[in-house]
């Protein structure tokens, strides 16, 4: 398990994402050799384990044992998933790009597992129910309230109808 601050979407069709990892990290070698990884969405409930996995090396310990996170099997790749996570994104590395302090691993998304708890009857994922966290400059934050949906800044307001 590695906690990665630098990650994001690269492309939606085909689905791709990236993670950036320092070459001196223990996980860097495993990423390079296996070419596979899982991005596990982390939440407020998992914040302490997330931090632990970011500051302790897996070189001499099993982070699953140390954090009591539940280890599961991925569906399409040979890397473990964190079952406690509401979303597991299985990835296969397409390209490695050395970028100074970090190597960017650009990967194809090969499978996504989502906990049904966070899905509605229409198949929509409700991120706010999962209570994800973000990390910025050494601090973890919860996301809080939704500020708007895509395009809300330009959407025309509906006019009120007058009753006749």
Listing of model-derived features with the role each one plays in the protein:
Residues 1-164:
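Basic, polyanion-binding surface patches
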């Amino acid at each position: 398990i590695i906690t990665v601050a630098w990650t994001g979407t690269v492309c939606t069709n085909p689905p791709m994402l990236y993670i950036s990892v320092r070459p001196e990290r223990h996980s860097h070698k495993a990423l390079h050799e296996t070419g596979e990884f899982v991005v596990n969405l982390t939440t407020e409930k998992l914040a302490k384990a997330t931090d632990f996995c970011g500051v302790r090396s897996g070189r001499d310990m099993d982070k699953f044992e140390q954090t009591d996170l539940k280890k599961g099997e991925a569906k399409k790749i040979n890397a473990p998933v964190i079952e406690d996570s509401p979303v597991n994104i299985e990835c296969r590395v397409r390209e490695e790009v050395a970028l100074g302090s970090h190597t960017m691993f650009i990967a194809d998304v090969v499978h996504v597992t989502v906990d049904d708890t966070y899905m509605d009857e229409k198949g929509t994922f409700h991120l706010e129910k999962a209570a994800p966290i973000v990390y910025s400059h050494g601090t973890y934050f919860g996301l809080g309230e939704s500020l708007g949906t895509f395009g809300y800044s330009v959407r025309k307001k509906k006019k009120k109808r007058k009753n006749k």
